[in-house]
Amino acid sequence: MEKTNVQPATGKLGVLCVGLGAVATTFMTGVLMVRKGLAKPIGSMTQYDKIRVGRGAEKKYLHYKDIVPIADLNDIVFGAWDVYPANAYESAINAEVLKEKDINPVKDELEKIVPMKAAFDHNYAKRLDGNNVKDCATRWDMVEALRKDIRDFKEKNGCSRIVVLWAASTEIYVPVC
């Protein structure tokens, strides 16, 4: 069996969400609330649950972070792309998933999360009509613009690594062949 070389989770982790609507803002609000000690990470496998390691007399229960390198919640920096220019606080209020009383304790942090312009084609999400979109001549130009956004976000926020999460609307089926 080939050995893996898992690197430690050091430095800031940039979490970029494609879409800044109900799913993304609920996720962000939850992480920010846990960071402030205002909520427990119930439902978060990596933060709250334990996993059994070993059998019989050797078995013990460890947190995931004690087994694999996982970023500390305090090291996460959020960013997003969205077709609408509203910041994460405005989007969370508009989504009406969480109550305002639950969002307000992290209002300042959410207001700082302003979406970058989305790489968007109206043909794939006909019910969306936002104006916060990239003006690109080709798909390749969109790809290059997104790559630049990621590099710029990483540098601006001092992140050592970036993950991108899909939390956007998906409407249309496009056959591959």
Language model segments and positions:
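Metallocofactor- and cofactor-centric catalytic cores in central/energy metabolism, strongly enriched
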Residues: 1-177
